[in-house]
Amino acid sequence: MAEQPESFALLGSIRSVETIARGRGVRARRHLAGKFGGRNWRKMKGVALIEDEDGWIGDAEIHWFEAHGVGRVRWKIKRRFTD
């Protein structure tokens, strides 16, 4: 079951999804496997419309980890896009 982000809410779908690292390239893979299970971890990034805990609404680049059978975990906002 996928963990939901704690510090922000997704208001739309995630676009421009890219894989940053996979397998041994994911530095936190041992921690992730120990806490959530799964084997084939990938670090991902994408852009989504979000609302953060301060009430700000807009597009932001977000990063997360995912594995087959586990889902998406450990979400982070990396960059906010302002007009």
Where are these regions (language model features)?
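Cysteine-centric segments in proteins
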Residues: 1-83
